[in-house]
């Protein structure tokens, strides 16, 4: 027989999960290297229809920091739903079988992770990166 989860229990679970994510974020920051992945742009080298210049690196994504941001966003979401200001709205949504807070958090954090995964697999062009983030967030 399973124990029923109460509102107070759910608040406690969210706080514990938030602390866990913060600890994971700190561990990732402490253990990560300075490995980065490039974000590039390609510009035309001449009139329309001609060739493109070689891609240039706009900036580099620090992988460890990006993973830490992903974990930090999740921790922040747990603390927000456990906060006095939003907990009532969170519980009302769950009672109505809706979890708006989690969907908003997932749309952002999963987009960060999907962009990082796409970079690891070789996607580096800024237009593609922005599109991937936007499409994923919109789902």
Give residue spans per PLM region.
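Transmembrane alpha-helical core residues of multi-pass small-molecule transporters
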Residues: 20, 135-136
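Helix-coil boundary and interhelical linker segments in multi-pass alpha-helical membrane proteins
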Residues: 55-59, 114-130
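Structural signature of hydrophobic alpha-helical transmembrane segments
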Residues: 68-69, 125-135
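Internal, conserved structured core segments that host functional sites
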Residues: 105-119, 134
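N-terminal topogenic module of multi-pass integral membrane proteins
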Residues: 2-94, 100-106
């Amino acid at each position: 027989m399973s124990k029923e989860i109460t509102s107070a229990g759910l608040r406690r679970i969210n706080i514990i999960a938030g602390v866990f994510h913060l600890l994971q974020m700190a561990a990732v920051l402490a253990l990560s290297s300075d490995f980065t992945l490039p974000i590039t742009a390609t510009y035309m080298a001449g009139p329309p229809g001609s060739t493109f210049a070689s891609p240039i690196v706009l900036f580099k994504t620090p992988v460890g920091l990006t993973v830490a941001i992903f974990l930090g966003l999740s921790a922040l979401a747990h603390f927000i739903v456990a906060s006095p200001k939003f907990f009532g709205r969170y519980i009302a949504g769950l009672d109505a079988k809706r979890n708006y807070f989690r969907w908003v958090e997932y749309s952002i954090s999963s987009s960060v992770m999907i962009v990082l995964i796409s970079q690891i697999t070789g996607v580096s062009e800024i237009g593609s990166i922005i599109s991937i983030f936007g499409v994923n967030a919109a789902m």
